[in-house]
Amino acid sequence: MFDGLDLKNLNLGDMLNQFQDMAKNAQNENASRIFTSKAGGGMVEISINGNSEVVDLKIDDSLLEDKDSLQILLISCMNDVIKQSDENKKMMAMNLMGGLGSFGQK
């Protein structure tokens, strides 16, 4: 069943540590990224970091008297920027999984 597999050189502890390091690096890299979305021709702008925490919000003064429009633009903008962050997380996870083939290689 395990013919051809060299179990003498297989060190699962090292592989796990390597994977954990790769995952931590990816997590730190993602957290430092900033994603920005604009709606209403730039009247609303939201920026979030890779942890999906809002780091900046800009609203044009002209929207402050139009609650319905402001709500629509905020929802649209927020959904878009969250989607950007989620797509980035998926891409980073796929890249991390692609790196599994390099386990145990020095």
UniProtKB/Swiss-Prot annotation:
Gene3D superfamilies: Nucleoid-associated protein YbaB-like domain (3.30.1310.10). It is found in: Cytoplasm, Nucleoid. SUPFAM superfamilies: YbaB-like. Keywords: Cytoplasm, DNA-binding. GO terms for cellular component: bacterial nucleoid; cytosol. The keyword Transferase does not apply. InterPro entries: YbaB-like_sf (IPR036894), YbaB/EbfC (IPR004401). It comes from the Bacteria. Its main location: cytoplasm. The keyword Thylakoid does not apply. One of its GO terms (molecular function) is DNA binding. Belongs to the YbaB/EbfC family. Homodimer. Binds to DNA and alters its conformation. May be involved in regulation of gene expression, nucleoid organization and DNA protection. This is Nucleoid-associated protein Abu_0429.
